[in-house]
Amino acid sequence: MPFDLVIEIPNEPGALARVAAAISDAGVNLAAATCMGTAEQVELHVLVPHAEAARHALALSQLAVTREREVVVVDVEDRPGVLADLTRKVATSGVDLDLVYVATNNRLVFGSSDLDGLKAALDE
């Protein structure tokens, strides 16, 4: 079961490396990462298969997970229009997406407060 963890880190050299090292040193695969922020602070999203192990490893490095949730990861073809096709299916099902990012190996990560509806929409 994949999880999206959010860690707030300072926007400074080495901050992302510290998070990545903490997770990988615990033997947890970091399958994707994306971050957005300001000049001072960044909200980092990481995709991990084992939330508890990643959270524990981050805590040992004095890094706190501010939000955590299960997400849907979809294997996709690397071609023009794939994101449009999938998000159209989700929209037609009436599911509101609040998170989308790209993971390794041609996969898309989707988040919604309606996780069951999202899974159903993507299975159609």
Name the predicted role of every residue range.
Residues 1-124:
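A conserved regulatory-domain signal marking ACT and ACT-like small-molecule sensing domains
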